């Protein structure tokens, strides 16, 4: 059971890289992070908020992110397995960190400070801006090395994740004649379980994702789209465990406005999320506890937010500061 758990963690660890194979690499990291202008670096720091002169100032530093590392891992793994949750995409990235970009808008280096030992992640690209290497260091010691190999069409074909332990983890990708990812296989060199992911499309849009272990279905994702291609419904089911139902609404500019999620079809278990520009989260209600979190922002001249005050049940809790440097 312990080995199986490790395998699943490895499987989802590589999911974020696998997104490149599904066409999510369109655009650069500036656009993925909702950044405007030619951003050179972003440094995020978090403090407890303190009231002063009808305003809020930085108090004692807060060492972790809005979510603790274990919660980030849990939510991130669920999302990588097929759960569509835009509030998760936003909140898991609000952590003490420093990110550097190249002039094409791609991340070259990232420091994460929300763990006991800070992590440094170095990104390397080829001449076509394909990510070919992602290496993580802890105290200057190599922790993981992720190597990505592309075919002549520029599609991700193979990924090798070296955890500097006994062996390597290997992912392989298969595409149809339209260039759509249809299968992703996962294996280790040792004689351990083989997983595979199957992707099904309709009119160029992903409508079904299935995850198999020993040819047994263990996870399923179903997706429905609107007239403009926007995601309007998503169902994610871990077989014999739980199911997430998600619905999304958009404004007149087709920008995400609201996200409504139910867990196990219970109106007492889920979330209601509202978004402003750049998909920045403004409202996050947890149904099971009726607990409301709100987020208010201050922007710089480029329109990027540089300060966020988080409120819990109307009480200011955290002061998030982003120092943004431009080319």
Mark where each language-model region is.
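Bacterial Sec-dependent N-terminal signal peptides
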Residues: 1-26
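Buried hydrophobic residues that stabilize the cores of well-folded domains
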Residues: 22-327
């Amino acid at each position: 059971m312990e080995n199986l758990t490790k395998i699943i963690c490895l499987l989802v660890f590589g999911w974020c890289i696998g997104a490149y194979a599904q066409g999510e690499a369109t655009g650069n990291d500036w656009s993925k992070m909702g950044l405007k202008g030619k951003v050179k670096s972003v440094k995020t720091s978090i403090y407890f908020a303190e009231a002063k002169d009808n305003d809020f100032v930085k108090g004692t530093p807060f060492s972790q992110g809005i979510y603790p590392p274990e919660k980030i891992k849990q939510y991130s793994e669920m999302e990588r397995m097929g759960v569509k949750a835009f509030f998760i995409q936003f909140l898991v990235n609000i952590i003490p960190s420093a990110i550097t970009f190249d002039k094409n808008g791609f991340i070259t280096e990232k420091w994460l400070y929300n763990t006991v030992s800070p992590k440094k992640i170095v990104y390397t690209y080829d001449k076509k801006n394909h990510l070919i290497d992602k290496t993580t260091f802890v105290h200057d010691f190599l922790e993981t090395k992720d190597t990505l190999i592309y075919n002549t069409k520029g599609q991700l074909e193979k990924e090798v994740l070296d955890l500097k332990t006994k062996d390597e983890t290997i992912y392989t990708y298969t595409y149809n004649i339209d260039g759509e990812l249809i299968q992703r296989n996962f294996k280790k060199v040792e004689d351990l379980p083989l997983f595979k992911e199957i992707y099904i499309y309709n009119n160029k849009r992903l409508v079904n994702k299935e995850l198999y272990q020993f040819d047994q279905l263990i996870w399923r994702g179903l997706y429905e789209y609107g007239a403009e291609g926007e995601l309007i419904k998503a169902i994610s089911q871990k077989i014999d465990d739980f199911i997430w139902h998600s619905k999304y609404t958009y404004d007149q500019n087709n920008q995400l406005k609201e996200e409504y999620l139910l867990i196990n079809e219970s109106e007492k278990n889920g979330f209601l999320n509202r978004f402003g520009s750049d998909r920045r989260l403004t409202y996050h209600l947890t149904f099971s506890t009726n607990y409301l979190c709100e987020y208010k922002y201050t922007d710089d001249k480029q329109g990027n937010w540089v300060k966020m005050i988080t409120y819990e049940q109307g009480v200011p809790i955290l002061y998030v500061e982003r120092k943004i440097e431009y080319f």
